[in-house]
Amino acid sequence: MPNSIFKKQLSPIKPGDPIDYKDVELLKKFITERGKILPRRMTGLTSKQQRDLTLAVKRARIVALLPFVNPEG
């Protein structure tokens, strides 16, 4: 599909690097302006990295480092 809607981006996370829920700047790269977690086909992460990312985003939301939804988006 040459005219794909989703452009795969290179992951800023190397395999084996930990994904910390306190690293808000890194987590913001993987959520939309509305606060939704981007799918793996858009992030270019491995499946384990995507699971770790999802867990980190959810933890960051619980401790109020990230919003659950962005009302301006």
Curated annotation (Swiss-Prot):
A GO term for molecular function: small ribosomal subunit rRNA binding
Keywords: Ribonucleoprotein, Ribosomal protein, RNA-binding, rRNA-binding
InterPro entries: Ribosomal_bS18, Ribosomal_bS18_CS, Ribosomal_bS18_sf
Keyword Ribosomal protein: yes
Annotated GO CC locations: cytosolic small ribosomal subunit
Domain of life: Bacteria
Pfam families: Ribosomal_S18 (PF01084)
A GO BP entry: translation
Family stated for the protein in its record: Belongs to the bacterial ribosomal protein bS18 family.
Purpose of the protein: Binds as a heterodimer with protein bS6 to the central domain of the 16S rRNA, where it helps stabilize the platform of the 30S subunit.
Quaternary structure note: Part of the 30S ribosomal subunit. Forms a tight heterodimer with protein bS6.
UniProt protein name: Small ribosomal subunit protein bS18
